[in-house]
Swiss-Prot record:
Signal peptide (from-to): none
Name of the molecule in the record: Protein Ves
Classification via HAMAP family: Ves
Pfam families assigned: HutD (PF05962)
CDD domains: cupin_HutD_N
Gene designation: ves
Family: Belongs to the Ves family.
PANTHER family per UniProt: PROTEIN VES (PTHR37943:SF1)
Membrane-spanning intervals of the chain: none
């Protein structure tokens, strides 16, 4: 299991200048990954990279709403904490709905190898026995193993079942499970 704090992660600027990315994990660590998770800041309208044979799940974490224009395939406005899935083959343009910067959680999976499910939890839970997983704290204080996690912190793992405990009356965590085909 690997723990992370978004505030301490390296920042990579996008080539088109529209935003920046903080990579949470890439498994296995190569261009031919099975799954990859990151946090992205979108500062202006811009194009997403086309990634053939990859499914993408994007979740708005904070900031202004973002409308994704997927050519003739879809038009979708991201709402806070509501995951949206689309195929990486689609050329996608992101437009800031009200001009405010947004912060997004992004999860990409190789379609022929694995699938991802992303959801928000608001109570103590135990993960399934998926082959990979990620948690990202949205609010509250949570305990994973012996580690305290607070907003903008999280963890990822390759295998196993793990219990995430909510330590306060209220809190939310973004949770992803990776299953292999």
């Amino acid at each position: 299991m690997e723990f992370f704090d978004v505030k301490k992660m390296p920042v990579n600027l996008w080539r088109n200048g529209a935003g920046e990315t903080r990579e949470i994990c890439c498994y296995p660590p190569s261009r031919d990954f099975n799954w990859r998770a990151s946090i992205a800041s979108l500062a202006s309208n811009g194009e997403f990279n086309v990634v053939p044979q990859v499914d993408r799940v994007v979740t708005l974490l904070d900031g202004g709403e973002v409308t994704l224009l997927g050519g003739g395939a879809f038009r979708h406005t991201l709402k806070r904490h509501q995951p949206f899935t689309f195929a990486g083959e689609h050329p996608v343009r992101a437009e800031l709905t009200d001009g405010r910067m947004s912060l997004d959680f992004n999860l990409m999976t190789r379609r022929d190898r694995c699938r991802a499910q992303v959801r928000v939890a608001d109570r103590t839970f135990t993960t399934g026995r998926a082959r990979g997983g990620i948690v990202y704290v949205l609010s509250g204080a949570w305990q994973l193993n012996d580690k305290l996690l607070t907003p903008e912190q999280g963890a990822w793992w390759q295998e196993g079942s793990h219990t995430l405990r909510l330590l306060k009356a209220e809190g939310q965590v973004l949770f992803s499970e990776i299953t292999y085909l």
